């Protein structure tokens, strides 16, 4: 999710439904992304969620633009503290999710759905099929498992690489 979508979301329910602010109004119909909030994220959300509104409240009472700059600056500090040499941005999480999901063989259409991308421009079959919440939930769960247990997926990733590159 983009930061603006996170800040506008009511997190009181276990199932999250939202339309990306970035694409709202650009399509004939705003696509709604639906998935179950993973327990790992729920713990963090509960720490920062205003119980009355369901929105996250970090105690920062300035404009969204200023808050966005503050988050970007803070991510830079965090990366430095963790000895990460690359530039870390809020968008890095979206890119990492997509990369990890692809590495473990999650279909592009499901990755697109989880990221809130339109799936109508990528072939005829996508006009006839629809990603379901359960598929998104499974993909998110599998990516979390991969991040926490990369060795578990090592053999699969190597086999997949061999197949994709037609190595024998």
Located regions from the model:
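Generic hydrophobic alpha-helical scaffold/packing signal
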Residues: 7, 46, 76, 99, ...
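Hydrophobic (often cysteine-bearing) scaffold residues that line and stabilize catalytic clefts
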Residues: 37, 41, 67, 71, ...
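Catalytic-site neighborhood detector that most strongly recognizes the C-terminal catalytic loop/helix
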Residues: 22-24, 115-149
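Conserved tyrosine-mediated DNA breakage-rejoining catalytic core shared by Y-recombinases
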Residues: 1-46
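Active-site/catalytic core of tyrosine-dependent DNA strand-transfer enzymes
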Residues: 36-85
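Short, contiguous acidic/charged loop-to-helix segments that flank catalytic cores in large enzymes
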Residues: 21-34, 59-67, 85-89, 130-131
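C-terminal catalytic core of tyrosine-transesterase DNA break-rejoin enzymes
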Residues: 77, 81, 92-117
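Acidic, low-complexity interaction regions
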Residues: 65-69, 77, 81-82, 108, ...
């Amino acid at each position: 999710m983009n930061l603006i979508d996170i800040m506008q979301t009511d997190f009181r329910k276990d199932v999250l439904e939202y339309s990306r602010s970035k694409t709202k109004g650009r399509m004939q119909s705003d696509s709604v992304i639906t998935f179950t909030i993973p327990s790992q994220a729920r713990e963090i959300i509960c720490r920062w969620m205003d119980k009355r509104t369901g929105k996250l409240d970090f105690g920062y009472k300035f404009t969204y633009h200023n808050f966005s700059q503050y988050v970007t600056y803070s991510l830079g500090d965090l990366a430095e503290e963790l000895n990460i040499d690359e530039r870390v941005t809020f968008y890095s999480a979206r890119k990492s999710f997509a990369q990890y999901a692809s590495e473990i063989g999650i279909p592009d259409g499901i990755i697109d759905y989880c990221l809130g991308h339109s799936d109508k421009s990528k072939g005829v079959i996508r006009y006839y099929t629809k990603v379901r919440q359960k598929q998104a939930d499974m993909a998110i769960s599998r990516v979390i498992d991969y991040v926490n247990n990369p060795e578990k997926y090592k053999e699969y990733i190597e086999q997949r690489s061999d197949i994709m590159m037609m190595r024998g």
